[in-house]
Amino acid sequence: MSGTTYPSSTRSFRYMHGPLIIRRILGNRPFSEIGEPSTVAVNDERGLVAVGGDLGYLGWSGYGADQYRWRQYRVGIYGVQDLRCRWVVESQWPVHSVAFHPTLPIVAVGTGSYDGGYSYEGELLIVDLLSGLSTSVQRGAREVLHLEWASEQALRVVVAPVDSFPGGRYDATAHTYAYTAVLERPDWSNVAGGSVQQQEFSGQRLEFQRPATEAVVSRAIAALAALTGEPWEPRRHVWDVQQLRDGRVLACAEGVLAESWRPDGQLEWRDRDEGGGRQLVIRAGQFDAWVNVERVLWRWVGTERVTESPLVVRVSLENGKVLDSLPLDSSVTLTAREDGWLALRSTNSYTQGWLALIRPTGQAPETRVPLGGFDARNHAFPIRHSSQLFFLQGKDHEEPSQDKYVVSVDPACRDGESLVQELFPLEWDPERAGHLFGGPGIEVGCVGNRDLVHAGAVHDGAGLLPGNVFVVRRSGLYGAVRWVVTADFPVTALDGDEDTVYVAFNSGELVAIHTSDGTVRWRQHLEVDGQPAVPLSLTVTGPGHLLIGTVDGRILDCSVD
């Protein structure tokens, strides 16, 4: 077995250059880099604006393995006049407050959240406006709810209680109060990491009403709209992107069921949806497409708990009109075969899952096949350019995440009933005998000699360990491994052809691999206008041409030099 192991990706925003060139950007707008905004501060003297935001959770009901090692919160520094992004800083926790120092080129940032059971965690960051580097200056995690400069040396902060068990007893009112303190330093531009002690946060207790998230976001959106001088709203999560034969680009995104962009880069149509589309399957003739729409099992509307039905719709590619929808009793993930057969696998049953099959010209499922349980980390296996319908199935129906096999489903076997054929174990190394997660992939090779190239990860109780992410090429019939490439960060998307496999990671890195032998052609961290971006979806549209959908809602039309 030949293979290549490349070093881990890093979270530094100093990226190497590579051969990938962005030719045009669809869905671009100011403040894209920070996602959904949470707080805004403007400094007219410096001509800068600081924005805290949230890029969002990467998983959905059909694929959840790409959430590991993901930091979704951001602080962006922008110019007031040109709205160009100067710096982007990651945060481990939600960003509550940002404040420019009255004289020094720094910004103080307060972050944090409740861990759901005990502690109010967070940190105080100092961001250097000259270098873009950030320093966590407090020792120990503590949620910082608000901050403002009282003078050049004094920073007034409002912090949450350490935890919800003061004195060892649960306090149900802990979220209703906070403590205010003044931190003093002679030079805040030269404060060492971890030098602010927890006892410095001891101060006066006060009532503190945490604002509703919707109100916080609404105020921040209004502030950014005022800066742009026109209506503004965030874009996030381009979950799927594809190109039609006529050059149009079709995509689905957070809050967007589907949208179409003309070859000249102008938006042709857009169907809005509170949840948004997750998968696109373009039908033969390219007149319409199936869209898999994400729906939560239930949500609160005011004080009422509302249950939402799963949704898969068929839309016209001419105008985006919804032509019909499928009645479903479960959320699903879509898998398509090259000849047009479509499979819908149920995702919200851990033991009694099913597979529904739709003919290439069909309008609704005709057959259901028992396939066992599904969960988004273990069983996700979206294989593109495939001559078969591939899935992951657990040997033990009571514990379907264990001993998973790659199986294929024949929609029309000889006896007239759909057939599930067991192909080979997902785990190819009997000595390791690991618990493997699934991931995206493609089928390559000629007729009669087809191989699978797919991503995945080796599970460990300690979390995702370095080197436990993999991309592997395997015989489509027997599962024999031809090559393996390992990595440290989860795979968000994968596509390719007979020459090159392109793999996107949630670290922001894109890696090109020789399809034949697994050697790495090149690797490059994705940047847009000099700032980091994270690829979430990608499609090869031709030799050396890619469409990349980003976590921050942009679509990148790229070529490889």
Question: Can you describe what each PLM-predicted range is?
Answer:
Residues 58-72, 115-122, 165-176, 252, ...:
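Short, solvent-exposed loop/turn segments at conserved positions within beta-propeller repeat blades
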Residues 49, 107, 155-156, 249, ...:
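Hydrophobic beta-strand positions that form the internal "hydrophobic ladder"
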Residues 54-56, 112-114, 160-163, 255, ...:
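Residue-level signature of beta-propeller blades and closely related beta-rich strand-turn architectures
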Residues 23-31, 84-89, 133-138, 226-233, ...:
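A short beta-strand motif characteristic of beta-propeller blades
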Residues 34-41, 91-100, 140-152, 194-209, ...:
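Repeated scaffold domains used in trafficking and secretory/extracellular systems
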Residues 3-36, 81-83, 211-236, 478:
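A short helix->beta-strand "capping" segment at the edge of beta-propeller domains
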Residues 28-64, 96-98, 230-255:
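Beta-strand-rich domains and repeat architectures in extracellular enzymes and scaffolds
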Residues 158-162, 167-186, 532-561:
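Blade-level signature of beta-propeller repeat domains, shared across WD40, Kelch, NHL, RCC1
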